[in-house]
Structure formats: C-alpha cells, structure tokens
Amino acid sequence: MKELFQKIWQNELQFLNFDAKFQDKSKLDTAECAIILSVNKDNYERYFLLKEFQELCKKIDLRVDIFSMQNAQICILNLFKSGFISKQDLLKALKILEKISKNTEIFDFILQEKVQSIDQKALFQNDFKELNTINLELQKLSFDENLKSRLQKTLEKFQNLEFNIAITGVMNAGKSSLLNALLKEDFLGVSNIPETANLTVLSYGKSEEAKIYFWDKKEWQNILESSHFNADLKEFIDKLDKSVNIEDFIKDKPLIQNIALCELKNFSSAKNKISALIKKIEIKSHLEFLKNNISIVDTPGLDDVVVQREIVTNEYLRESDFLIHLMNASQSLTQKDADFLVHCLLNSRLSKFLIVLTKADLLSKKDLEEVIVYTKESLKSRLVDLDENLVEKIDFLCVSAKMASDFYKGLASKESLQKSGMQEFENYLFNELYAGEKSKIALRAYKKELHLELKNILSEYEMQNRLIKENKQGVSEENQKLLLELQKQNTLLKEAQDEISNSIAKLKNIDSGIDNLVLLLAKKLKERLIDEFKYLKNNAQKLNLSRILNIVDITTKDGINDILREIKFENIKKIEELKTNLSLKYDFLKDDFDNGFEGFKDGISKNIDSIFQSEKFALLRLKIEKLSNLKSDLYELETNLDTVIFDTFKEFKMSEILNSLNINGAFFEFLNDKLKHYEKNQKSKLESLEKVLQSLKNQDANILNSFEENLEKIEKLKQLEMGLLNAD
C-alpha cells in the first residue's frame, strides 16, 4: 500500500499509519469511498474547494487537509481489504469518476487486490446480537418498569426489521420457477397457488393463509376511465362485465377476504376473470427462506393490460429494498424490458439492482456474456442524452432455476446445484440486503436509542451516590441544590413546550409556488411534443410512439422530481433550523431531539415524493397516445394537446396534497413525543430523588449501604457504554 501512496501523492506524501481504521465502518457508502480514493496530488486543491466535498468530509468528522485525506484513504483501503466494501461496486464507482479524476493507479490496485469474503448476513446478525445483549443487560440495571418496558419495545422494534424484495419481468420470464428454486419448494405456479396476474406479497407466517384485496369503487372508476383510451382494456372490461357481477366485489371500501391457500386458485389464476377485480394478494407461509424477515413482492408481468396494476406495482417498487428483474436469456432484451429498466434507472431511489438471466442452462457461457454486453449497450443507447453511467447501477447474474429445483427434488446431483448459479444468486441477495443502507441505518438507530437510555440509567445511579456521599459528609445543602436543579429543569421543560408550540404556529407550509411550477412544466411538455411532431412532418418521418411517450415520461418526471427536490430541501431546512435552535437553547433536550430525527426527515421526504399522482399521469399517457395516433393537422393537434396536458396537470392538485401532509403538524408531534419521553424520565428521577432524600433523612440502612452496589452498577454501565461505542 505504501508504494501505491508514493505513486499517487509523490512529494506530498505525509507520515502515515498504514494500519489506520475507521471507528465506524458504516458511515460512508461505496460512492463516497470512491470519491475520497480519487483524490490525489494533482486534484486535491480542486476537491478541497468544492462545497459538496467539504460536506462529505464533515459527515465523517474529517478535516479538509492532505494528511486527513491520505489517512481516510488508508482507512477505506483497509476496510476494502477486510471485505467490508464490495470490490465490484468500488471499481464501478471509480470508473464513473474517471471523467473528472485520473485514478488509474488506485483502480489497478483494487482490481489486483485479493480481498476477504465476508458473510454479510452473519455479520449483520452478530451486530444485532451484540446490541440485543447490551439491551438485556440495561434492562437488568433499569431502575423502573417504564424504562425496562421501553427497552423491550426497542428490542422488538429492531428485531422485526423487514426487507422487501421486488421481482419484475415480462410474462414467461421465469418468475415462478426462480422463486420456487429460491424458496427450495414448488410453491408458486402450482395447482394450489397458480401463476397469477395479480401483485402478490409473500411473507412469513406461522400458519399458511392468503388475503385477497379487491379494488374499491374509486380505483375501479379510474380503470374504467383508462379503458376509454385503450381498446384492449375496453374489450377486456366489456367481456368481464357480461360474465361477472362486478358489484359483488367492488365496494365503497375495499373488500378484503381471508382464504385458505387451497382456495387461491378460485380467485387469482390468470385464467380466472375475477383476478381482474383483485388489487393485490398477500400470502403467509412458514417457508424457511421467509424466516429471515424477507418479504417477496411478485409483480404482474410488465405487459399487463390493466394500467392500474402497473401503478400498484410501482408503489411497491418505491418501497422495496432491492429489485430483481428477470429476463429469459434466450429472448434477450424486449422493448418492455428496456422501457422498464430505463424508467428504473432514471427514477428509482435504489443505488443498484440486479438483472437475472433465467434459463441460463439453454445457452453457452459465451452466449450469456454476449447477452449481457448487448443488454448494457442497448440501455446505454437509450440513455445517451441523459447519463450512460446509470447502467453501472445494474449487476448481472445467470441462473438456471430448473437445475437448482431438480437438485432440491432429489432428481439431480449437487453438481447440478453448483452449476445452476442459484447459490451465487442467494449469497448475492443476502449480502446486498444485510450490507445495504437500510441495515446500516437500523444498526445506527438502535445504537443511538440504547446509548440514550444507558445515559439515563447511569445518571440515576450517579445521582444516588452523590446524595449518599454528601449525606455522609453532612452536606444537606448540596442535596437540596440537586433537587432544585431537577425542579428548574422541569420549569425549563414547560418553557420549551410553550416555545415549540409558538414556533410551529409561526412556521409556514412551504410549497415553493408548486402549482405555478407545475403549469410551467405543462407548457414545457406541450412545446417539446409539438417540436417533435413538427420535426416528423417536416422530415416526412413515421411516428415513433415509443419516442413520444419517452418524451412525456422524461420531461414530466424530471420536472416533477426537480420541483419535489426543491420542496423537500426547503421544508427539511426549516425544521432542521428550528431543531438546532431549540437544541442550543435547551441543551438538556439535544440527545432526545437527535434520536430518530434522521428517520423523521426520511419519512417527510417519502411523503413529499408521494404527492405526485401516478394514476393521473398514467391517464395522461393514454390520452397523448390516442391523440398521437389520430390523423389531425398540427394546429388541431396542438389545440388538443394544450387542453389535455393543462387540464391533467391542474388535476394533479399537488399544492393541495402537500398541504394535507401537514408537515409542520408532524414535526410538532415528533418534538412533543420527545418532550414527553424526557418529561417521563425527569418525573421518574424526581420521584427517585425525593425517595432517596427521605430514606437518608430516616437513616434507612438499605439506602446507606447501596453506595458500593451502585459503584459496581456504574462500572458495569461504563463497560456497556464502551461496548456500545465500539459496536460496528
């Protein structure tokens, strides 16, 4: 490693400890690690001036100077060599940075370095086990039942952390076969649980059962409205109306039916007409794979005629922790695949996802590699006007579900399983989930909550010993002083409550003129479409409907994302400023305010993202598609587009929905919960203090003799605190 640093830093190389390691291994993601590694003697001055780079350094308490930068690079490389950073992901990130930073030496070093393989699932579970052990020890040391109960609830909350995997693909991509191989049992697509056209959520349950959720009247009305612009959907619904009494299933409030798994074939089979009335299906099973707190979302095929099912799918994709897209290796990249993948690359919050080439046993290794290259190049060509590097978010694996299933059924040897690619797929999946951002956030949040409770317990025992010690020395004034301190904090607490109420009342909901911005976006979309139609007419070119819809997608979604990003920034900025001011004024509340604040902000961001109505947008696409196919002159087309686009954009009602989120009210509830938590602790401390003072006054032998016991507990708590701070 020293030779590498001599190459990239030359005469700027500092005196360094090449065994240096980060105290917290999870503070930086792979992209941030790559940015720090790309700093060298030729570019460090430019990097140091960038505001974004300064913010990155601040995140890990790193000074912006040469020594600190080189030391951080050593820490990152040691993390990488220990197996905590994915080699493949780090190389991808460095490759993207090549355009702004020449990083050949560091790239080659990582490429050639042999790294340890880490079982991320085992590591994650071990980290949780350590924190659970600390939690149980704190429960033993707790001084009241309320605190013990809070710690137990915290343990259960994090113990039940769930991961959601979404599986997508066109019909016949092999979803059921792959899932059966993953579950190691023929569970889906068999007689009892047929292949379904509905979105199906599969999760762990002690008993096996299913829940059927039907569309409500409002949702069904949207489907009917969509059918006016889609001939296939109209024909489908007309046939359905003649064969099924729709009113039996479509109610004002969604009808939910609990059924046994064996009854599922009567509802969900793609051949069964009733399946069209079903919004989603939830299946509970005690399959071994699902015991890992993993839920699998099996989505309808991308070529589904019911647009609303696609909207429900997109809502689940937004909440998923990982996305797996299946493609039949023999059929390669279809138009539907390409459209979906480009949409995900442009809009998904996920940092990466996986394409699995199914039925891999039907092609040679060389042919499979060619399919991967072709898929990457095809996607890059679709992204040429945007960002080709987005393709680097995709990983590829080749799997034969049949070979794996044959082994699990006892029809093939272990060699068949090893050649199937199924074990690599399963290991990849566990590593991505358990080393992902959700896992890191959960561990950090758990540590923070435990540390807060530990400090409360520690302060209680220290306070008791201070009272006992001062009593022995005959300093009763000090005891009264301590009592007054607690009473004063109670007064300040009331003051803080009043100030929070007044501050929240003065806060304005920030919508950044959202309705005007949406109308400007509508104007931009109409102009882009008219420019495209004029170009086609002037050059006597045939209409490419896919390109028209691509313009609609990219213009609308990019514009909406920009608007929402600004709204999120402004709203989060105002609540951060208020929280900071309150923490400075009432410093005894700082830890409580910090606890859970990142999760609160994340929730606000997700709520703001959800205000864009996907159903209205889907209807807009159908209307534009129909207008595009009509043989009308440019003037008539422009008039019709103007009406359709502006009317639909007004229907988005984004300002109204944003106000209904009541962000200020939610922030008030967050702060109020923290005040209640602190108030409970203070009340408990005050009661304990008064009890101790009374016992001391009565010369109670038990309290007088508890000094040494408390010292042991204090020592134990300090050891637990060290364990908590060192826990990874």
UniProtKB/Swiss-Prot annotation:
Parts of the chain that traverse the membrane: none
First-listed, main subcellular location of the protein, grouped into a coarse class: cytoplasm
Annotated compartments: Cytoplasm, Cytosol
GO terms assigned for molecular function: GTP binding; hydrolase activity
Region entry G2 motif, spans: 195-196
Residue ranges of the region described as Required for liposome binding but not for tetramerization: 470-695
Keyword Cell membrane included in the entry's annotation: no
Cysteines engaged in disulfide bonds, as pairs: none
Segments of this protein annotated with the region G4 motif: 358-361
Region (Assembly domain, required for tetramerization): 1-119
Consequence recorded when altering residue 175 to A: No GTPase activity
Swiss-Prot/TrEMBL keywords: Cytoplasm, GTP-binding, Hydrolase, Nucleotide-binding
Domain called Dynamin-type G: residue spans: 159-442
Loss of function: phenotype: Double dlp1-dlp2 deletions have no obvious cell division defects, have no flagella (possibly due to loss of expression of flgP) and are non-motile.
Catalytic reactions on record: GTP + H2O = GDP + phosphate + H(+)
Keyword Hydrolase: yes
Region (G1 motif), start-end ranges: 169-176
Region (G3 motif): 298-301
Family, similarity comment: Belongs to the TRAFAC class dynamin-like GTPase superfamily. Dynamin/Fzo/YdjA family.
This protein's domain notes: Protein is very flexible, is probably able to bind membranes in many conformations. The N-terminus of DLP2 inserts into the assembly domain of DLP1; this is followed by a 9 residue DLP2 linker which allows DLP1 significant movement. The linker is long enough to allow the GTPase domains (dynamin-type G) of DLP1 and DLP2 to heterodimerize.
Function comment: The heterotetrameric DLP1(2)-DLP2(2) complex tethers liposomes and may mediate their fusion. Initial binding is probably mediated by DLP1, while DLP2 couples DLP1 subunits and increases the effective reach of the complex up to 45 nm. The role of the nucleotide is unknown. This subunit alone weakly binds to liposomes; GTP, GDP, GMPPCP and GMPPNP do not change heterotetramer binding. Tetramerization is required for GTPase activity, suggesting the GTPase domains (dynamin-type G) from DLP1 and DLP2 must dimerize to reconstitute the GTPase active site.
UniProt cross-references to PANTHER family, sorted A to Z: SARCALUMENIN, TRANSMEMBRANE GTPASE FZO
Name this protein carries in UniProt: Dynamin-like protein 1
Native source species: Campylobacter jejuni subsp. jejuni serotype O:23/36 (strain 81-176)
Annotated gene: dlp1
